[in-house]
Amino acid sequence: MVDPGPITPGQVSFLLGVIPIFVGWIYSELLEYRKSWVPLKPHSDNNLVELGDVAEKDDDKADLLEGGLARSPSVKFHNSSIRTNIIRFLSMEDSFLLEHRATLRAMSEFGAILIYFYICDRTELLGDSTKNYNRDLFLFLYVLLIIVSAMTSLRKHNDKSPISGKSILYLNRHQTEEWKGWMQVLFLMYHYFAAAEIYNAIRIFIAAYVWMTGFGNFSYYYVRKDFSVARFAQMMWRLNFFVAFCCIVLNNDYMLYYICPMHTLFTLMVYGALGIFSKYNEIGSVMALKIFSCFLVVFLLWEIPGAFEIFWGPLTFLLGYNDPAKPDLHRLHEWHFRSGLDRYIWIIGMIYAYYHPTVERWMEKLEDCETKKRLSIKAAIVTITVLVGYVWYECIYKLDRTSYNMYHPYTSWIPITVYICLRNFTHQLRSVSLTLFAWLGKITLETYISQFHIWLRSNMPDGQPKWLLSIIPGYPMLNFMLTTAIYVLVSHRLFELTNTLKTVFVPTKDNKRLFSNFIAGIAIALPLYCFSFVLLQIHR
C-alpha cells in the first residue's frame, strides 16, 4: 500500500522551479536546431559568421573532451551578474538559452531523474514485491560478478609513488576505488536480498568507507594544504547536493540516508583538525596533539552519558529521524546509533594517512632486500596478519549482531588493517585492480541513495526500503536484471550530473562569485518556498 504523504511546500517549490528549466532547455534545443539548419547564402558575409560559429563549437567540443562541461558553462555563466542572468532566463532570451544549453540540459535531466524517483517509490504506476534471501543464489551472483570482472577488467597500473618515484603503489587510488566497489556490491545485495546473516560484514564495510573518509581527506589536506572556501564548498556539494533534493522531492528526513550525514560530519572533523593552525601541521608533536584532540572530542561526545543529546539536541531538526515502523524511538536515536558505530575509525584513517609515506619507504626498502630475506619478512607479516584476522573472526565477528555492535567501534580497525596488509604484501597485488569494481566504486554515493527509490521501495515518507521495485511482476530474476540495469545507469548519470553542475555553480578560485551564487540560490529558493506554502494553505 503506497502512502505518498501530504504534498509539501518543498515538493511544490521543486515543480515550480523545474518546469521553467524544462521549458528553457527544450526551447534552447529548438533554437540550436534552427540555427544548425540555416542555409548558407552564396557570396554572403553571414557565411563567415556561420564558419566562426562552427569553429567555436569545435572549441567547445575540445573543452568537453578535456573536462566535461567544466569550463564552458561556468565561465559563460558569470560573464554578467547573477541578477542579469536570472532576468535573461525568465525572459527566455535566445542568446542566453543557447549559451547555457548544456547547463539547462543537465538541470533538466537531474529534475527528470528525481521525478522518476517519485514515480517509482510514491505512486502505484509500478508495483512492488517482497524480498527473498537464498544463500546459494546470493553467492552465485556475487562470485559470478567477480569472475566476469576478473576476465574482462583486470588491469595492471604503472603509477609511480609521489613520495619516492618508484612503483610502490601502496593504497593507490585504483585499489581504494576497487575496494569501495566490491564492498558496495555486497552492501547493495545485502539490502536487496535481505541477507541478514552478513550484517556484521556490512558494519565493517561501512566502517571501511568512513576509514577512507579520514584517510583520503587527511591525505589531501596534508599534502595540498588547500583549506579554501571553494574546496570546502565543492566537498559539501559532492556529499549533499543530490541527497538534499531527494529529501525535498520525496519528503524524507536527512537521516534516512545516514551515510551522507556521517561522511559529512567526519569530513568536517578532518577539515577542522587539519585546518586549525594548519601552518604547524608539519610538526610531529602538533599533529600528535591534534589526533589526540580528535580522540578526546569523540570520547567526550559519545562515551559520556547525556553529552551526545546535549550537543546534538539543537540540530534535531536536521539530524532527527523517526522510522514509521518504530515511532517510540527518540528522534536522535538513529543518529546516535549510526554515528556511534564508526566514531573512532575516521581517526584511524587519519593516522594511517599520516604514516603512509613512512610505510611506503619501509616497503621500498623491503623490495630492495635480497630475495630470501624479503620472502621471509613477507611470510612472517602474512602469517601474523592471518592469525590476527582469525582470532578477530572467532572472538568478535561470530558474535550476534547486538553483541557485535558493542565491540565494533573499538575493533573495526582490525579487519580493515588485515585487508590492507593482504592486499598490498606483493608488488603484483598492488599494481593490479579490477576496473569494473573501481568504476562502481566511483559512484557509491549515488548507488547508495538511489537504491532506496528505484531499486527498492519504501512506499512512504521516511520509510525503510522493505520492498523491491517490480517492473516485471512474476519474473523475479528478469525484474532484478532490468531494475538493476536502470538503477546503475541512473546512478552513473547522477554522478556525472552532480559534477557537471558543481563546475557551473561552485567556482574553484573565485570566492566572491561563489558567495553570489549562494545568495542567489537563497534568493530564488526562499520566495519559491513561501509562494508554495501560501498556495497549499489556500488549497487546504
From Swiss-Prot:
Keywords: Glycoprotein, Golgi apparatus, Membrane, Oxidoreductase, Phosphoprotein, Transferase, Transmembrane, Transmembrane helix. It is a multi-pass membrane protein. GO terms for biological process: plant-type secondary cell wall biogenesis; xylan acetylation; xylan biosynthetic process; xylan metabolic process. Disruption phenotype: No visible phenotype on cell wall acetylation in single mutant. Severe growth phenotypes (e.g. dwarf and abnormal flower organs) associated with reduction in the secondary wall thickening and the stem mechanical strength in the quadruple mutant rwa1 rwa2 rwa3 rwa4 and characterized by reduced xylan acetylation and altered ratio of non-methylated to methylated glucuronic acid side chains. Absence of interfascicular fibers and xylem cells differentiation. The triple mutants rwa1 rwa2 rwa3, rwa1 rwa3 rwa4 and rwa1 rwa2 rwa4 are also dwarfs with abnormal morphology. The chain crosses the membrane at residues 7-27, 134-154, 182-202, 203-223, 235-252, 257-277, 291-311, 377-397, 436-456, 470-490, 518-538. InterPro entries: Cas1_AcylTrans_dom. Expressed in cells undergoing secondary wall thickeningin a SND1-dependent manner, such as xylem cells and interfascicular fibers. Mostly expressed in the middle and bottom parts of the inflorescence stems. Mainly observed in the more mature parts of inflorescence stems, but present ubiquitously. GO terms for molecular function: oxidoreductase activity; transferase activity. The keyword Ion transport does not apply. Disulfide bonds: none annotated. Its EC number is 2.3.1.-. GO terms for cellular component: Golgi apparatus; Golgi membrane. Its main location: Golgi. Belongs to the PC-esterase family. CASD1 subfamily. Probable O-acetyltransferase involved in the acetylation of xylan during secondary wall biosynthesis. PANTHER family: N-ACETYLNEURAMINATE 9-O-ACETYLTRANSFERASE. This is Protein REDUCED WALL ACETYLATION 1. It comes from Arabidopsis thaliana. The gene is RWA1.
